[in-house]
Design a protein with these regions (language model features):
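C-terminal motif of bacterial Sec signal peptides marking the signal peptidase cleavage site
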Residues: 13-15
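Charge-dense, helix-prone N-terminal extensions
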Residues: 25-202
């Protein structure tokens, strides 16, 4: 009886140890930053959901910034991590926006198919410290996201040819909003580069 009980305890201890070792040796899930077979057109044609909650207030003029919004630090950190996983992006100080914003620069080896959509240099978009962004999109998408509450067209969107789809994307307050925000950043990247990158995720 004692031998049977001892054997059972030994088996349980060994099983737990084996499970612990297996868990500690598990390969971490890698983040996705690969291209996809889904074309940029198909991604851009996927209807956006309605954004819940009140529309975020902005200045409505240049400098075009959000007003009275308190960013969520964890969501902001995740936005920066995911946005700069897109291929060939460099994180630099902005040359377009206010000090403190972060420019999203295309590396020299990344082709640009819509240079007129970029305001200056190779900084196709920038992220403000509160997690809002300015980025170019196709006009149809810009109008849709404005209608569904995800952002608004820039006050200078009608000033220059190519800027028609220049938008502010509102800050994300939770993971669901962050997913849409990263999708739209990816669509902007695809719009100016002609690539078909998938939205990065971890």
């Amino acid at each position: 009886m004692k031998l049977t009980l001892l054997a059972g305890i030994t088996f349980m201890l060994c099983s737990c140890t084996a499970e612990t070792i297996a868990e500690s040796n598990a390969v971490p899930q890698e983040c996705n930053s690969e291209t996809t077979q889904v074309s940029a057109i198909e991604l851009a044609n996927t209807p956006l959901p309605e954004r819940s909650g009140a529309r975020i207030q902005t200045t409505g003029r240049v400098p075009h910034t959000q007003v009275g919004f308190d960013p969520v630090a964890e969501i902001n950190d995740e936005l920066f991590k995911l946005a700069f996983m897109l291929p060939g992006l460099q994180e630099r100080p902005t040359i377009v926006s206010l000090p403190g914003a972060t420019g999203m620069w295309l590396a020299d080896d990344v082709s640009v198919v819509k240079p007129a959509a970029i305001v200056s240099g190779r900084e196709f978009a920038h992220i403000h410290s509160d997690g809002s962004l300015h980025a170019p999109l196709p006009l149809e998408r810009a109008l849709e996201l404005e209608q569904k509450g995800w952002g608004e067209r820039h006050p200078w969107a009608d000033r220059n040819q190519g800027w028609e789809g220049l938008v502010m994307l509102y800050s994300a307050s939770n993971e669901d909003e962050l997913k849409i925000l990263v999708q739209l950043v990816t669509e902007s990247y695809n719009h100016v580069t002609g690539r078909s990158a998938a939205p990065p995720n971890c």
